[in-house]
Amino acid sequence: MIQVEDKIISMNIFKKYFVCDLNACKGACCVEGDSGAPLTAEEEKKLNNIYEKVKPYMEEEGISEIEKHGVAVYDSEGDLTTTLVNNRECVFAIEKEEISLCSIEKAYLDGAIDFKKPISCHLFPIRVKEYRDFDAINYEEIKICKPACECGGKLEVPVYAFLKEPLIRKYGEDWYQKLLEATKVLGK
């Protein structure tokens, strides 16, 4: 572990390599899992506010689940998450050419909304656990991301470098620069 400000960071963020390979994994992170994407209360509010603008990008099954249950639910561990379709894929997942993508991100890229996607999705495979006095930043290694680990290894791109944009979105440019300073100390 290494500390940057009040963030405790797993060494795997520096040691492991990662670059998403959608052609290999087919966007499985939007489909596989026991619960939806973790959300903050602010993100749930944002999703409710932009839902009508995202809706044209969504698949019917996702729309139907949101109409029944809303954009977010509490999972079995009591965490706020995006609602699922058939207890499997995120309601915002869409399939294009056999690859699962995010309808929120598609709406963002088209300029329909100003919200890219939930930060937990943007940061994946980093998972952040917020405590009262610090954030724990960990790397979640899962089987479906094996192609991303292989691709990152070939390109020699560590997790923290691949996720530069979402880390800056979450913690700011100044914090990310301090993280880069820490990598120099670590020899990464």
What are these regions (language model features)?
Residues 1-188:
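Short loop/turn segments that flank or connect secondary-structure elements
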